């Protein structure tokens, strides 16, 4: 693991636009040299644990580029060496020196250490028990989330559950995948028992982790790791409970990424962004979302500073069914409606397509580095599709129709007979298809592919021409720099 300075005397606090609990200067800090005593101290510490979610190493770039590995899109961008580390990953020719893999390894680590700090310090504090429970619940949720990212990308990783008092405390061997998932599940169960529901939060705290967020995360963990009847039943129970807590689908699919409607009725957990000027993108101080900037059509003038990354492939676009309104709300294609009277040209892209769903107008985001557009990590449509999948895998295929239809109906696919009377295998294929289209470019497709049964990931990748992909590529390599810093780290098979 990267040698990092431990959190001891000062805890940096990230505060983000869109939720008051994070809407302050990024350099507020907690001086623990005089003791860790007040609610403000505890809240500042847990706020700091959210910060790495914002970074380019995670949701501001690397997580969504996993869709490129998954074959939904190509890098695009400026060509040449622009994004070559992502190109190498997507073409399955990367090695252990790959910079994108290094980012993904390093991204969650500071968050884990900050959660450990909270979990060590807060239990002994003499503060209101409800607030204490909520703060501990947030830390448990976030630690589980960071480890869930790591274990799906790399397999076993060092299991750090205490604050690091020296660099040597970080030089741990890799724990087993089973050990990592045991911690993830335990942490999420703690989070569920401690966190408030979203309806119990004041507006000033909107955007914090909630009971529902932890429940949805646990359902996803079960879908990934266990895949047995007992846990599929638990997934259905969790998803039903979330549905009873007031969540519903947005009427307009496009509203999910409208900054004016963030943390809405469909949203379960979002990475909060604070549109801040004069911050370097690669700096950990950056608080602005670059999602619209990265994915908008390059040189089109449609929005501020578009780079043209993550260009949808023709194979992906062909998967849209006739009448699916998500097509024109997800991608730009020749002849599609745009905004501000502009016309889309396939010349803006090497594939002939660009991602539309995240693009902000110049009115919404007049400067490329001032966007407060959140990243939606978990939303209710995902919960409905997990429920449908779990029901089908239990052999309850007819019951899987209703949650699947609810998602498809919002997309304009109102012919329910198209999903009725299917075999379990046919329904499985429908749900896989629906997850791909509904959650396109949101960072889920790669994680879905590697959890599907029957060698799905490699068969799909080979079918679209990514023939260099092999079983070793289902995990990323442990980065060379990390193994040089920590000789206890072993490499993944084949790398």
Identify the meaning behind each predicted range.
Residues 1-28:
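Bacterial Sec-dependent N-terminal signal peptides
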Residues 18-21, 39, 50, 58, ...:
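Long, intrinsically disordered, low-complexity segments
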Residues 20-82, 181, 189-192, 200, ...:
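An aromatic- and glycine-enriched ligand-binding surface/loop that stacks and positions planar moieties
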Residues 39, 43-47, 51-57, 80-154, ...:
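Conserved, well-structured interaction surfaces
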Residues 84, 88-93, 316-380:
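Flexible, polar/acidic helix-loop-strand segments at domain edges
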């Amino acid at each position: 693991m990267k040698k990092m300075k431990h959190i001891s005397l000062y805890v940096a606090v990230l505060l983000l636009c869109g939720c008051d609990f994070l809407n302050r200067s990024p350099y507020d800090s907690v001086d623990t040299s005089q003791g860790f005593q007040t609610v403000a101290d505890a809240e500042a510490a847990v706020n700091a644990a959210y910060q790495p979610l914002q970074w380019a190493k995670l949701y501001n770039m690397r997580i969504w580029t996993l869709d490129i590995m998954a074959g939904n899109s190509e890098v695009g961008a400026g060509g040449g060496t622009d994004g070559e580390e992502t190109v190498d990953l997507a073409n399955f020719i990367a090695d252990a020196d790959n910079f994108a893999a290094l980012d993904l390894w390093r991204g969650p680590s500071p968050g884990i250490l900050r959660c450990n700090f909270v979990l060590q310090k807060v239990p002994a504090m003499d503060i209101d028990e409800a607030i204490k429970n909520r703060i501990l619940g947030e830390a448990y949720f976030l630690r589980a989330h960071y480890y869930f990212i790591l274990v799906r990308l790399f397999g076993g990783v060092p299991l750090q559950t205490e604050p690091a008092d020296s660099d040597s405390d970080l030089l741990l061997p890799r724990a087993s995948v089973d050990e990592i998932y045991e911690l993830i599940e335990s942490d999420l169960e703690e989070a569920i028992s401690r966190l408030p529901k979203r309806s119990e939060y004041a507006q000033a705290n909107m955007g914090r982790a909630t009971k529902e967020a932890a429940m949805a995360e646990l359902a996803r963990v079960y879908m990934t790791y266990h895949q047995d009847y007992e846990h599929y039943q638990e997934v259905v129970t969790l998803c039903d409970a979330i549905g009873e807590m007031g969540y519903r689908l947005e009427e307009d699919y496009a509203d999910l990424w409208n900054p004016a409607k963030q943390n809405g009725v469909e949203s379960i957990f979002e990475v909060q962004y604070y549109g801040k000027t004069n911050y370097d993108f690669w700096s950990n101080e950056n608080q602005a979302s670059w999602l619209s900037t990265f994915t908008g059509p390059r040189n089109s003038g449609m929005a501020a500073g578009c780079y043209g990354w993550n260009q949808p492939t023709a194979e992906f676009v062909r998967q849209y069914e006739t009448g699916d309104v998500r097509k024109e709300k997800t991608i730009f294609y020749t002849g599609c409606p745009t905004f501000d009277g502009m016309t889309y040209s396939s010349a803006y892209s090497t594939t002939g397509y660009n991602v539309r769903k995240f693009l902000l107008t110049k009115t919404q985001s007049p400067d490329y580095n001032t966007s407060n557009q959140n990243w939606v990590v978990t939303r209710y449509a995902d919960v409905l599709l997990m429920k449908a999948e779990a029901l089908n895998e239990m052999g309850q295929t007819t019951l899987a129709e209703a949650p699947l239809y609810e998602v498809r109906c919002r997309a304009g696919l109102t012919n329910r007979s198209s999903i009725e009377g299917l075999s379990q295998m046919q329904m499985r294929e429908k749900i896989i298809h629906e997850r791909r289209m509904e959650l396109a470019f949101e960072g889920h497709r790669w994680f879905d592919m590697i959890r599907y049964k029957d060698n799905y990931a490699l068969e799909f990748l080979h079918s679209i021409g990514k023939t260099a992909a092999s079983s070793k590529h289902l995990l990323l390599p442990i980065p060379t720099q990390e193994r040089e810093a920590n000789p206890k780290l072993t490499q993944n098979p084949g790398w």
